[in-house]
């Protein structure tokens, strides 16, 4: 397996890195574009014709009638290669860290340990070397030539003093690192924080402990939402008794048998939808 594996010298695992590896480039009147027509052969023998507009920065999309080109790491040679195979030959954590920056895959959190007792984290995959990621369109005149280069100077952690590393399938990094490598989105940190808390509950771990950690479904993150919903429903106990009963017996877990968990999760989702729906509607109008 590639996502998790071992060569008996090191063991590794990957989770999504959520780094910013794309910029929208605002094209100007002098920007050269051209159309490419492609034919996609389908399994049933039919052919789907597809046309797209390209530029020197990447494929072009019109937003509010203005052309923007998507400059994306996946379109760069450094982001697609077979360097990942070198991980199989690594004998130590240091070997794996040395390989990480050269590997051409979508950016992942590399977690690696070795038989000598070392452990480390580093972002593995193609990252553009441009120094200022932007959440807004970048003027074509300000396009950085560093987009053509892979970022070799990237943060890593090896053998932390507290003896613990975790990712939880989410973005990892300091506030300073985030200013350089974000914002490529993020996964909610609830899972990461719960893994962190579990790791600090013990000083020694067996394989079964890590397996139990993977199966940990305690709904810690939703506990405040559970309390809030229960408070609201208890304002009319007669009308809401069946829901109150479900919440009082929710088992505090993401269990298939927990009706209360489903109520709390959907309650949180609905509150967020109500609060942000007007903003989302306005953004959709602006995007046409």
Where are each of the predicted segments found?
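A terminal-accessory region detector
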Residues: 237-288
């Amino acid at each position: 397996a590639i996502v998790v594996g071992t060569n008996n010298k090191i063991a590794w695992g990957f989770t999504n890195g959520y780094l910013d590896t794309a910029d929208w480039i605002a094209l100007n009147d002098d920007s050269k574009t051209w159309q490419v027509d492609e034919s996609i052969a389908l399994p049933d023998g039919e052919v789907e014709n597809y046309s797209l507009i390209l530029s020197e920065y990447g494929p072009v999309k019109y937003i509010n009638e203005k052309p923007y080109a998507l400059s994306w790491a996946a379109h760069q040679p450094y982001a697609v290669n077979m360097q990942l195979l070198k991980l199989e030959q690594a004998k130590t954590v240091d070997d794996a860290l040395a390989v990480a920056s050269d590997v051409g895959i979508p950016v992942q959190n590399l977690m690696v340990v070795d038989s000598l007792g070392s452990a480390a984290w580093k972002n593995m995959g193609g990252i553009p070397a441009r120094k200022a990621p932007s959440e807004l369109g970048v003027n074509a005149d300000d396009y950085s030539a560093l987009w053509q280069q892979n970022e070799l100077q990237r943060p890593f952690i090896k053998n932390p003093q507290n003896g613990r590393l975790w990712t939880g399938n989410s973005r990892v990094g300091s506030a300073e690192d985030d200013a350089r490598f974000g914002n490529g989105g993020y996964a909610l940190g609830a899972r990461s924080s719960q893994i962190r808390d579990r790791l600090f509950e013990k000083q020694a771990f067996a394989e079964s402990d890590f397996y139990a950690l993977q199966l940990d479904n305690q709904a810690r993150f939703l506990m405040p939402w559970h309390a809030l919903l229960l408070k609201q429903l208890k304002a009319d106990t007669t009308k809401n008794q069946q829901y109150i009963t479900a919440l009082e017996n929710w088992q505090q877990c993401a269990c298939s048998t927990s009706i209360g968990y489903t109520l709390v999760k959907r309650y949180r989702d609905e509150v967020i939808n109500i609060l942000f729906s007007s903003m989302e509607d306005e953004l959709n109008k602006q995007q046409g």
